[in-house]
Amino acid sequence: MAKKTHKMGVAAGIVVIVAVVIFVRMMINVKTYRYSTVDTVLRNPLIGFAPNADYFDAVGDNTLVYVDVTWRELEPEEGVFDFASIEEENFLDTWRASGKNVVFRFVCDEPSDEEHMDIPDWLYEKTDDGIFYDTDYGKGYSPDYSNETFIAYHAKAVEELGKRYGGDSFFCYIELGSVGHWGEWHVKYEDGIKRLPSEDTLRKYVEPYISAFPNAKLLMRRPFSYVSEYDLGVFNDMTGHARDTMEWLSWIEEGGIYSEPEQPMELIAVPKVWESAPVGGEFTSEYSMEEMLTDRLDGTLKLLSKSHMTFAGPMCPIADEDEKDYPDEVYQVLKRLGYRYGISECVMTDIKLTGQLSVRLTVNNYGTAPIYFDWHMFVYLMDGSGNAIKRYDTGVDLTEICGQESADVKLNITGDDRKHLLNGTYSLAVGIENPDTGMPQVQLDMNAENMDGYFFLN
């Protein structure tokens, strides 16, 4: 009798367990969606190639353009800033209207084949203590960067640039710029050009940019102390040149001493600079673009990956030539420039007892660097016509998801929104919005139906 009672108890227990399982399954419904990556070029904002803005046909589908301006072009007469000519020559109204952004560099000395000055005549007359040079770099005029009059007028010029272009993120990356040949913070002192001044004096060329461009990310050619002090990025104008790039990477990873100024300056080790500030630059002119995209492609790709670069220009493959001739090679390069976000998994858990639909997304960055601007990822309720009815901020900080990293985000949907999703009236989509437009503008690396930046999850 005891055995029979025991068996009946066990059976009853099993019935209860089965009933609970059935009840839970009826009350909780879980759907999992997975998305593979896509093997295609993604022309996303704020990353990629930055061809010269004044070469219209070179730009194509690229989202960045490069503009450099000499002081002579900017301020031909004291206090008179010729923005109109700069904007016309570089098609800035066109690029702004088409949603592109600018990589900018202000230059005081750009060597060329002819004798010339890149500072205005009026400033030369007020200072007149630089030197005209003729070296294997070319010909030009190197100002005395320790001249306090020159420094004061430089601060005013950068201030005016900021008033014109620093109010939004159209000018998104500012390369400093200002000092040395091509704005690269070096001069050919061995040919008689006066060395750069001390670190404290050179600081006066950095500080005006900090206040003038609060919405942009600033970059320097070398990791001087200002890089860590002001959270600046870095740029390499010898990308693709193995020896020079490895030397540049050694500065980033280990620091060192920069002996060119009149007083040697310390280079600060910033091995993780790319995690919080952009790395840019351009391809070396030592080799042809054809050579870098063919015989030297493997080495170039490895250097790009090690550098965690976000953009390259103006020396870069251009749309109407290189991109047409070497599409596969260009794609390999672009894959190694900047972010490449995508959703790999979406889990929707509906709990009937609580009336709550939980959505968990796994956000991946398949690229080599994060985005450096405060762009938000949203989940959208989409109606049958493809209109976004409502949006939910996922709260994920995309700037913290570095290259080859991922993060899970969760959100809960209740009420009528949940009902419309469950009965199929609405569907879910995900997108990354440009805060300037309030619209999703990032192509995600995920194999999912998409429309105008909305990527459907179910």
Language-model segment annotations:
Residues V30-F150, E266-S305, M309-D325:
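N-terminal substrate-binding region of glycoside hydrolase catalytic domains
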Residues I17-M27:
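Hydrophobic alpha-helical membrane-insertion segments, chiefly the h-region
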Residues G130-F150, A157-I193:
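Active-site groove signature of glycoside hydrolases
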Residues V65, L161, I174, Y209, ...:
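Conserved, mostly hydrophobic/aromatic
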Residues I28-T94, G166, F170, T354, ...:
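Non-catalytic accessory regions flanking glycosidase/transglycosidase catalytic cores in CAZymes
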Residues A2-I17:
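N-terminal Sec-pathway targeting helices
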Residues V333-N458:
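Extracellular/luminal regions of secreted and cell-surface proteins that mediate adhesion/ECM remodeling
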Residues Y33-D54, R96, Y173-W182, K188-I318:
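Catalytic-core regions of glycoside hydrolase
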